[in-house]
Structures are given as C-alpha cells and as structure tokens.
Regions:
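Terminal edge beta-strands and adjacent linker/stalk segments
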Residues: 16-17
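Short S/T/G/P-rich N-terminal loop/turn motif that feeds into the first structured element of a domain
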Residues: 1-10, 21-99, 106-116, 121, ...
Length: 144
C-alpha cells in the first residue's frame, strides 16, 4: 500500500485539509546517491533546510537539469553540508514547483555558513535569474 493511500495518512489529511490555507507537495527521487533516504539515523538531531524551485517559462529542461545537477554537486564542496538531496518534484499537489532540495546541517548556524559559502553564492547568482519563485522551510526535525 502506498503512503498516500494508507488509512493513517488519509485520516491525517482529512484532519489537516480543513485547516490548511495553502499547501505545497514535494515528492522526489534524489539526484545522485539513490540510497539516500530521509529518516535515516544520520538525520536525527540535525537542522534541515528545504527549498522548492519554480522556474520561469522559457527555461529549458536541459538548463534546469544542469542547474539541479550543479546544486547536487555542492555536497562535496561545502564542509558544513552533512547531507544534500535534490530531485524533480513528483507530487500531484506541486503548485508549479518543479524541483526540490533538502539540506541537512549539524546545527542551525551551519545554514548561515552554507549560505555565505563562495560555492553556494556562485550557484545562487546563476540560478536566481532563472527562477519564477521559490519556497523555503527551515526546521529541526520532530523527535530529535
């Protein structure tokens, strides 16, 4: 049985939807290491940064793929980045967001180090002109 159709998930959806002003789904297969899974032990006790990408009309699929692969390649270049998964959005409730990124850090302050890192800044300068929008969420996982 899929997660989406599981009775417990359906029960939660029925409870949340009436209270939800707006939502955005992000389901994807990671670019790069196929065995990377959220929820693994190495995620516990960390700080998570998630970002959804919506590209402008006219940005080709090849350009998008190149940018997302470049983002995925940051994993080995920025020491504070403990985990990075990037992938194409597979959610049916995507609100136009085509790709997503989930980054994991040891602590919240490491996100600022990542944000200011020259490799990240170089990527940001390259991708910003191509984006129609983005959505970010930074959090400490529940239960850690």
């Amino acid at each position: 049985m899929t997660y989406e159709k599981h009775p417990e998930h359906q029960k939660l959806v029925r409870k949340i939807l009436p209270r939800l002003e707006i939502g955005n789904g992000m389901d994807f297969f990671p670019i790069g290491e196929p065995n990377t899974k959220l929820g693994d032990a190495n995620y516990k006790g960390h700080f998570v940064h998630a970002f959804n990408f919506k590209f402008k009309d006219g940005v080709s699929n090849d350009e998008i793929a190149e940018l997302m692969n470049e983002l995925a390649d940051l994993k080995g270049k920025i020491p504070v980045l403990k985990e990075l998964v990037v992938g194409k959005n597979e959610a049916h409730w995507h609100r136009g967001f085509q790709y997503g990124q989930i980054s994991v850090f040891d602590k919240k302050e490491d996100l600022m180090t990542y944000d200011k890192h020259p490799e990240h800044q170089k990527f940001v300068r390259k991708i910003i002109p191509k984006l129609a929008g983005g959505n970010t969420m930074d959090f400490i996982p529940i239960g850690t």
